[in-house]
Amino acid sequence: MKKKLVSVLFAVMVLIVSIPKYSFAAESGKVIFINMNRTTIKSMQDIPSLKAELEKRGYMGLMNIRGDKGTDDKRSLASMGAGGRANLASDSYINFKEATKENATIYKSSTGKTPKKINDLSINQSLNENEANGQYGSTLGSLGQTLSDNNFKVAVLGNSDTVENGELKENRNICLIAMDNYGRVADGNIEDINIEDDTMPFGIRADYDKLTKETKSLYENNDALFVDLGDTYRLDQYKGFLNEHTYSKMKKTIHNNISKYLESVFNMVGDNDVVYIASSFPSKLAYKNKERLSPIIKFKGNEKGLLSSSTTRRDGIVANIDVGVDILNEFGLENKSMVGRAYSLIQKDDNVDFLSYELEKMATISNKINSCKYFCRSCICILGYRYGSYII
């Protein structure tokens, strides 16, 4: 009898131990993060399918976009993936490529690591820069590394490539949020996703038919997918070459293309999946006007409201360093080196109006502080204490 009992207990223990962590993915659902860079809250309302979805559900927040030793698009994305303010090498040393026989050899010889499908061939430059000159001790690629270590599959899709002096200027910074500690992403497409279109900024745009098809394929074969809708970034960079009429025309076309794409995403995802839509950095005009918090939306379940986190302790105000932590939390994971905090979801029906008002109010206060900071120390102390860490 004892032998039978021991045998049964042993068999149960073997079954429990043998269940891989990945087997819980179906329960936790999948994650899609969509970067709609250089987009404002107001512009998001101009995208029909997104506006319709927000009328029904979605939690919104305004996101601090600061990095380490500077504030820009790439540092914001890297800070999301690091879970702390991150520093990077200059643009010329960020070099994500899909693996070939030649560049895979170069990558391995410089890092000593086995390349994956997508690799930053110059990752040591950013790792060394962040370690030597970073002020916050953040670890690049913490999000991607933690997912990989726990057998969750990660993919990236899209780019924000532009044209400079007649030559293609690569921008595959979406990889900075998804990569592991060595600048690698296991799956995706960052190169063959755009088509020529002379009616669009820089004469190129995303191929939305291919983007939709590959989103579905990568979604089915991975647990976390990070998508860069580069057309919004390209439009903001190209704005100086346009007048009011041509800018509005291009913007409307881009928004309609994005609307169809997002509609396909909303129809594709399951009930347990989570979709994030964010602008990793404000538009140039918004930044100039002191609107230095970017919108982020989390679609989870059927309720609507505000995002909050203990990083900022203000309803509706979050930080880029919270993004990676919240994504890990959706998979039941954590990384103690990441200092951001997972979101709290606060019910509020008028979330869009509330955040639009908050953003306008903070921009006004920021302008007031900057206009009198050399003359009114009490203004800085009072207003800066309440809002300064978010907007100045």
Briefly describe each language-model feature range.
Residues A25-I369:
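Soluble extramembrane regions of membrane proteins in the secretory/endomembrane system
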Residues F10, F24-A25:
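Residue-level detector of intrinsically disordered, flexible termini
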Residues E358-I392:
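Core alpha-helical transmembrane segments of integral membrane proteins
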Residues M1-L5:
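Positively charged n-region of N-terminal signal peptides that target proteins for export
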Residues L15-S23:
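C-terminal segment of classical bacterial N-terminal signal peptides
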Residues V6-V14:
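Sec-dependent N-terminal signal peptides
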